[in-house]
């Protein structure tokens, strides 16, 4: 691991990042400091990028069963700019609004990226959440059917964004569970 050039963040940049995210000034500065430690040597932080492997190995993501999907959704061409990292941290912050969290949760859970959370996606979500590869096919089918019975309002065996949004809005635990504290900030 290298180190970026240790430029102080300009006050104007800090204010802009604070206006564009749900992060506090201190959180942005903490993320900036951590980013500097991980990025390639000799690069200015605005020009530097981190690899998906670097980001997915962060303690906050290393144990997350959806780390590969999170990285796919927030990275660009499998690399993270400083602003990509800020965007990811902002969405997973406590202050992020429910609609933003729901939008990104949908994108993360849409494994096949077809614009719906279908049976295949639901099965992958269930297996990851339960950390189980040896679940019986019958139980997996029952759990998937139960989720669809509760949330699939038009009975097409998949969840549109609006159906997913409706289900998450009724879930009291969603806002608390869709949080990640990055960088130890």
UniProtKB/Swiss-Prot annotation:
Residue ranges occupied by any EF-hand domain in the UniProt entry: 97-132, 147-174
Organs and tissues of expression: Isoform 1 and isoform 2 are expressed in testis.
Oligomer status and interactors: Interacts with ITGA2B (via C-terminus cytoplasmic tail region); the interaction is stabilized/increased in a calcium- and magnesium-dependent manner.
Binding-site positions, Ca(2+) 2: 152, 154, 156, 158, 163
Coiled-coil boundaries: none
Further comment found in the protein's record: The binding of either calcium or magnesium may significantly increases the structural stability of the protein in comparison to apo-CIB (calcium- and magnesium-free form).
Protein name as it appears in the record: Calcium and integrin-binding family member 4
Pfam families in the cross-refs: EF-hand_7
Example of a GO MF term: magnesium ion binding
Gene: CIB4
Keyword set, alphabetical order: Calcium, Magnesium, Metal-binding, Repeat
Alphabetical list of InterPro entries matching this protein: CIBP (IPR051433), EF-hand-dom_pair (IPR011992), EF_Hand_1_Ca_BS (IPR018247), EF_hand_dom (IPR002048)
Ligase recorded as keyword: no
Binding-site residues, Ca(2+) 1: 110, 112, 114, 121
Superkingdom of source: Eukaryota
């Amino acid at each position: 691991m290298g180190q970026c050039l240790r430029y102080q963040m300009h006050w104007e940049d800090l204010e802009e990042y604070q206006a564009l995210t749900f992060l506090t000034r201190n959180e942005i500065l903490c993320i900036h400091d951590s980013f500097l430690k991980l990025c390639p040597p000799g690069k200015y932080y605005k020009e530097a990028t981190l690899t998906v492997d670097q980001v997915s190995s962060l303690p906050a993501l290393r144990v997350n069963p959806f780390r590969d999907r999170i990285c796919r959704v927030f990275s660009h061409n499998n690399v993270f700019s400083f602003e990509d990292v800020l965007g990811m941290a902002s969405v997973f912050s406590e202050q992020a609004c429910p609609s933003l969290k729901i939008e990104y949760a949908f994108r993360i859970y849409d494994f096949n990226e077809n614009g719906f959370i279908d049976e295949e996606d639901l099965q992958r979500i269930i297996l990851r959440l339960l950390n189980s590869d040896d679940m019986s096919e019958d139980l997996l089918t029952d759990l998937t059917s139960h989720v669809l019975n509760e949330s699939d309002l038009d009975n097409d065996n998949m969840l549109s964004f609006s159906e997913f949004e409706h289900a998450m809005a009724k879930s009291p635990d969603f806002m608390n569970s869709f949080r990640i504290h990055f960088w130890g900030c």
